Swiss-Prot record:
This is Large ribosomal subunit protein uL22. One of its GO terms (molecular function) is structural constituent of ribosome. The gene is RPL17. PANTHER family: 60S RIBOSOMAL PROTEIN L17 (PTHR11593:SF10). One of its GO terms (cellular component) is cytosolic large ribosomal subunit. It comes from Suberites domuncula.
Length: 191
């Protein structure tokens, strides 16, 4: 079992999944992972399935050189509304999310309350091939695989704030207090 970059705060309420040397583009996978970070598990799976069907888009923020502008990307705060639909990256992330979900079921966690707390994509070792060019030359033909790690945390439901019986007093600055006193003194002197 490999090491994770960080460990969850409460291991009993979390589940992990990781994949190493995955034959999928690093840059596309990194952008896809950032798009689902912080989402609930069910919402992330639905979103990634929509990406595969091109109903929703992945905004490209860091690795956006040469990425075309799409109307769907306007919904995100993306500079230049750049985005793509990285199908293979979405499929790999769906597999990892399903793996994490089954790990959560083994640990008896509530899968409806799982949130993606940590997801990280690292570069893996390049796979080297060659392509043959004109005049007897040979050029490298490299692939950029990646490692993916994630953990999901079971979030507790937010407790609503209790209402106070006493109304809290508004804080008033010194300048406003002086103005109020001056007004009171002037209006009191007129009577």
């Amino acid at each position: 079992m490999g090491r994770y970059a960080i460990e969850p705060e409460n291991p009993a309420k979390s589940c992990k999944a990781r994949g190493e040397d995955l034959r999928v583009h690093f840059k596309n996978t990194r952008e896809t992972a950032q798009a689902i970070k912080g989402m609930h598990l069910k919402k992330a799976l639905r979103y990634l399935n929509d990406v595969i069907e091109k109903k929703q888009i992945i905004p490209f923020r860091r690795f956006s050189g040469g990425v075309g502008r799409k109307a769907q990307a306007k919904n995100f705060k993306t500079p230049g509304s750049q985005g793509r639909w990285p199908k293979k990256s979405a499929q790999f992330l769906i597999q990892l999310l399903r793996n994490a979900e089954s790990n959560a079921e083994v640990k008896m966690l509530n899968t409806d309350a799982l949130v993606i707390d940590h997801i990280q994509v690292n570069r893996a070792a390049h796979l080297r091939r060659r392509t043959y060019r004109a005049h007897g030359r040979i050029n490298p033909y490299m692939t950029s695989p990646c490692h993916i790690e994630m953990f999901l945390v079971e979030k507790d439901e937010a407790v609503p704030k209790g209402e106070d019986d006493t109304a809290q007093k508004k804080k008033v600055s010194q300048k406003k207090l002086k103005k109020q006193k001056l007004k009171a003194a002037l209006s009191g002197g007129a009577d």
